[in-house]
Amino acid sequence: MFPRLTRFRTLGAFCAALMALSMLSVAVSAQTDFETEIAVEGGKWAKYYEQADLEGLMTLYVDDAIVALHGQPALFGIAAIREYFSTRIGKAESVFELDYELRETHGDIAYIISKYWLKATDNETGVVYKDAGRSLLVYKKQDGQWKIAADIDQATPDVAWPAPSGLN
């Protein structure tokens, strides 16, 4: 009956759909950027540990963080975390491999779940220690930076040696 009006409605609906899609792609892109940013944060932990940089490692945690490592009592607060790692870091040549399974950001909270493989060769004895499992790092945004609020790892039967890259 009104062909010209129908064309405008169709054109309007098409434009609205394009605008909605463009906003969706911006949101997906922003989420991907945050996930990449969080993946980089996860890599910092392994880098500082491998380099025996205790001070660098401590910069990654909030003051009231909790660390719960398999086979160890939970550590509450930065002082306990520092004390624990100070007796271990730098005592062995350590190499980590990480396989991120999930990275998500929700406002000022983010988390990473990853498979990990650790190979540590004692600097004095040459004895090799291997560990593999799954970890959960929960991050809080603090003063514009992502900081670890919870660091949990566990042994798990579906993550075992050798590491996928061939690290052995």
Residue map of PLM features:
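Surface-exposed, charged secondary-structure patches
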Residues: 83-125
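Hydrophobic pocket/interface hotspot
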Residues: 45, 57-58, 65, 77, ...
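Short beta-strand edge/turn micro-motifs at domain boundaries
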Residues: 132-162
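Short, low-complexity N-terminal intrinsically disordered segments enriched in polar/charged residues
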Residues: 21-63, 162-168
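A short gly/proline-enriched turn/hairpin at secondary-structure junctions
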Residues: 60, 66-76, 87-92
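Bacterial N-terminal signal peptides that target proteins for export
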Residues: 2-16
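Beta-strand elements of well-folded, non-transmembrane domains
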Residues: 50, 118-122, 139, 156
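A mature extracytoplasmic/lumenal domain signature
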Residues: 71, 114-118, 152
